[in-house]
């Protein structure tokens, strides 16, 4: 009887895990780039750390309640991984915050990371291109369903934004579905 109870608990845990996985897979984002390139250059993590302002992105479920002020802050942890703090302002003025952890996957370039905001579940975070002075960055992942354009300045100006769009197009991304972030 005891082994039957253990089997039942095991099946319940497996079913719950399958349900959580299915929930993440239900919403399929359109592919904005069918052949995501490898990151263009190495990343100096010390220079990449700090606050980044989201300039534009592809639509994602986890940012839909964000109406303005989207930032990502990265800081180094003692174990070599990276703290990730994503913040945004909702329409009611409240702040939404997500705390995560990133680990470097490719130590030769530091451009490929895995990021988790939910326990053992990690997603790809590829720094596809960045300015030599680290004033901007273009981030994606291998499926082509996610894209972020980031800047060190909250309002980098129209010329800088158009340059980011041009660079994303050069990486093969369809920039028509971009959502431009208001940084009030």
Predicted regions and their residues:
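A beta-rich soluble binding module of mature secreted/lumenal proteins
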Residues: 2-184
């Amino acid at each position: 009887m005891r082994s039957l109870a253990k089997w039942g608990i095991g099946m319940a845990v497996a079913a719950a895990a399958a349900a959580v996985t299915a929930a993440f897979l239900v919403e399929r984002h359109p592919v904005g780039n069918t052949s995501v390139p490898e990151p263009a250059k190495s990343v100096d993590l010390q220079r990449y750390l700090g606050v980044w302002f989201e300039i534009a992105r592809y639509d994602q479920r986890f940012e839909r309640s964000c109406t303005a002020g989207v930032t990502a802050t990265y800081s180094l942890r003692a174990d070599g991984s990276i703290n990730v703090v994503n913040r945004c302002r909702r329409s009611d003025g409240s702040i939404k915050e997500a705390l995560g952890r990133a680990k470097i996957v490719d130590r030769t370039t530091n451009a490929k990371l895995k990021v988790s905001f939910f326990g053992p579940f990690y997603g790809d975070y590829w720094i596809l291109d960045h300015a030599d002075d680290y004033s901007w960055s273009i981030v994606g992942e291998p499926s082509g369903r996610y894209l972020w354009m980031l800047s060190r300045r909250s309002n980098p100006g129209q010329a800088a934004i158009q340059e980011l769009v041009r660079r994303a197009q050069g990486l093969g991304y369809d920039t028509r579905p971009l959502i431009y972030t208001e940084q009030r």
